[in-house]
A protein has these predicted regions:
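C-terminal coupling/interaction segments
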Residues: 260-297
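ABC transporter nucleotide-binding domains
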Residues: 4-5, 12-206, 212
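ABC transporter nucleotide-binding domain
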Residues: 172-259
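Short, flexible helix/strand-to-coil boundary loops that buttress conserved ligand/catalytic motifs
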Residues: 72, 223, 296
Length: 297
């Protein structure tokens, strides 16, 4: 059976307001999936249903083709967006306790806790109370709590929130270690540039419905704009008068522009070559931010 976590046609309403509408996507083993959407789009509700914190009105969540039960969910790692830590409890003591709740012996939980705190740069503060930590360091503790039992699946709600650039790099390294070990990782984030850099697959949700999902390459190809970039030896200002060209940006010899459907990019390239050397010319790959705006507006 393929190691895939599948969300299939999940819907959920609160009172008369439907917040999820037939949400469907896969999280594949060994791949990192970014879950992006505006505030209130349905990301957290979806994750809570995946972990059994909330029940779906309809639809299913399966792992390796089987419905999730309590025993299966104990093998998942989950980091909620809200702080779920005991403020007056020691860092290591807290993670050890949570590891035991997932079935680890105290010795195993202690060993794994100290290894994780070392990896996350918190080993020297293992006995401090959580309330003494910065928000960013509390975030690291929450990640350690999600990882301590070596989960089969990892679901993280805004794991990069409040982290400085160095802490982000550490977190990225930890998540990549998990995917390299074959773990499917799903995380939500508002940092689209980070998601684009880090993730293999993307899921975009808006108003409780999935607007786009697939691999990073597939989405870029599917939502590619008729946009090109050119760099010539001299000034590229002549593009202003070229038929079918709409300038997006122009900076001396470099320009980014859109082509109308009737325009011929090869004819334009020949025109550029007639005017002098062309250092580069080609289509511009859309960014995740551009794809996000296109599918959610």
């Amino acid at each position: 059976m393929t190691d895939v976590l599948t969300v299939d046609a999940v819907s959920r309403s609160f009172s008369e307001r439907q917040v999820l509408k037939d949400v469907t996507f896969d999280v594949t083993a060994g791949r990192m999936t970014g879950f992006v959407g505006a505030n209130g789009a349905g990301k957290t509700t979806t994750m809570r249903i995946m972990l059994g914190v909330l029940a779906a009105d309809s639809g299913t969540v399966t792992w390796r083709g089987a419905p999730l039960d309590r025993a299966t969910r104990r093998r998942f790692g989950y980091m909620p967006e809200e702080r779920g830590l005991y403020p007056k409890m020691g860092i290591a003591e807290q993670i050890v306790y949570l590891g035991q709740l997932h079935g680890l012996s105290r010795d195993d939980a202690r060993d794994r806790t100290m290894a994780l705190l070392e990896r996350l740069g918190l080993a020297e503060r293992a006995d401090e109370h959580v309330e003494k930590l910065s928000l960013g360091n509390q975030q690291r503790v929450q990640v350690a709590a999600a990882l301590v039992h070596d989960p089969e699946v990892l679901v993280l709600d805004e794991p990069f929130s409040g982290l400085d650039p160095l802490a982000v790099d550490v977190m990225v390294g930890v998540l990549r270690e998990r995917t390299a070990a074959g773990v499917p990782v799903l995380f939500s984030s508002h940092q689209l540039e980070l998601v684009e850099r880090l993730c293999d697959d993307l899921v975009i949700i808006a108003d409780g419905a999935i607007r786009a999902s697939g691999s990073r390459t597939t989405l870029r190809d599917s939502y590619a704009l008729p946009r090109f970039a050119i760099e010539v030896a001299d000034d590229a200002g002549w593009l202003r008068d070229a038929p079918g060209v709409t300038i997006v940006s122009l900076d001396g010899p470099r320009a980014v522009f859109d082509l109308s459907p009737s325009a011929d990019d090869q004819a334009l390239l020949r025109t550029a070559l007639d005017k002098g050397p062309v250092h580069s010319f080609g289509p511009v790959t859309p960014s995740l931010s551009e794809i996000f705006r296109e599918v959610t507006q």
